[in-house]
């Protein structure tokens, strides 16, 4: 069967699956069909690279009904945050530990299941709060969901669901010593709200310190930071992640277009292509059960440019 016919059948099936067979298509349905058609063309290009070394593969997912500019506006809400090259004055030194072939903080039961930021550009808040949750659990305390909405509503110099900087959020949390409350007390709404204040006596988790690093060309040191300090907040270029289904991301992203904040929980160097295990905030149905695998070395997607470790 010709590829054009396959794409047409897929287009029809997907759209019928979303909108049913009754009635006529509205303008919004036609727009979604046009976006899906553009996605199919884009997938052909993204998958045109040789499929070797477990390279990533791309296809139809929950974002295929969005044009790239819509996807970027809705889901890529992180601002670039400059970090000094390691080592630099003021940075916490990294112990010179031996690197295992594979390590994942999930195996230590200190990483919560993947969350979903929905149509809120609050990735910067999700990554920071997830790092704090894990840092607390690494100390032997319970692994709880903390309030992302509290950071979205209250963080100074950030814009909530319209975007923000994870380093700016960490600096604000550290300087104010604000206590993050449980998600159940201040649940996620996926929209900006008015900041709710809690008494200082309120139980919660505060950020004692954080360190920001630029590990470009030093990803072994970055792996040591992960081992020594816990999951790391990073900012990446995730435009091509709109179409990601699995495999190891090695191409199709830039080290100069940071737009999305995520959390690195581990790495795997057992195969031909070593990779970072990257926890996203687009739900567990995206990627590899909510994770992306990004090649270690070469600063793929700018993953080593702005890296933060959190201490609670």
UniProtKB/Swiss-Prot annotation:
Keyword Calcium applies: no
Gene Ontology BP terms: proteolysis
Subcellular location(s) of the protein: Lysosome
Catalytic class of the enzyme: hydrolase
CDD domains linked to this entry: Peptidase_C1A (cd02248)
EC number: 3.4.22.42
Signal sequence extent: 1-23
GO terms of molecular function: cysteine-type peptidase activity
PROSITE patterns for the chain: THIOL_PROTEASE_CYS, THIOL_PROTEASE_HIS
Pfam families: Peptidase_C1
SMART domains linked: Pept_C1
Domain of life: Eukaryota
InterPro entries in alphabetical order: Papain-like_cys_pep_sf, Pept_cys_AS, Pept_his_AS, Peptidase_C1A, Peptidase_C1A_C, Peptidase_C1A_papain-like
Gene3D superfamilies linked: Cysteine proteinases (3.90.70.10)
Summary of the function given for this chain in its UniProt record: Proteolytic enzyme possibly involved in normal cellular protein degradation and turnover.
Family indicated by similarity: Belongs to the peptidase C1 family.
UniProt protein name: Cathepsin O
Origin species: Mus musculus (Mouse)
Gene name for this UniProt entry: Ctso
């Amino acid at each position: 069967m010709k590829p054009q016919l396959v794409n047409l059948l897929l287009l029809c099936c997907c759209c019928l699956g979303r909108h049913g067979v009754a009635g006529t298509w509205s303008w919004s349905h036609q727009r979604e069909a046009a976006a899906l058609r553009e996605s199919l063309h884009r997938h052909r290009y993204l998958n045109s690279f040789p499929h070797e070394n477990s390279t990533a593969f791309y296809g139809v997912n929950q974002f295929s009904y969005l044009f790239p500019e819509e996807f970027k506006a809705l889901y890529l809400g992180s601002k670039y945050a400059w970090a000094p090259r390691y080592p630099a004055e003021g940075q916490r030194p990294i112990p010179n530990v031996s690197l295992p072939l594979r390590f994942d903080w999930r195996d230590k039961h200190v990483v919560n299941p993947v969350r979903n930021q929905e149509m809120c550009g609050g990735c910067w808040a999700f990554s920071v709060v997830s790092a704090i949750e894990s840092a607390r659990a690494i100390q032997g305390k319970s692994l709880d969901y903390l309030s992302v909405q509290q950071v979205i509503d209250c963080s100074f110099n950030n814009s909530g669901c319209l975007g923000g900087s994870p380093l700016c959020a960490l600096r604000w949390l550290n300087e104010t010593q604000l206590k993050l409350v449980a998600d159940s007390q201040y649940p996620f709404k996926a929209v900006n709200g008015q900041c709710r204040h809690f008494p200082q006596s309120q139980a919660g988790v505060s950020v004692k310190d954080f360190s920001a690093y630029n590990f470009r060309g030093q990803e072994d040191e970055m792996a040591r930071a992960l081992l020594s300090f816990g999951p790391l907040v990073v900012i990446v270029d995730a435009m091509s992640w709109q179409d990601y289904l699995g495999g190891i991301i090695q191409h199709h992203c830039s080290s100069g277009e940071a737009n999305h904040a995520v959390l690195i929980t581990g790495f795997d160097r057992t195969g031909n292509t070593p990779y970072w295990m990257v926890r996203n905030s687009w739900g567990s149905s995206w990627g590899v059960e909510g994770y992306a695998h990004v090649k270690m070395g070469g600063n793929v997607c700018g993953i080593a440019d702005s890296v933060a470790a959190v201490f609670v």
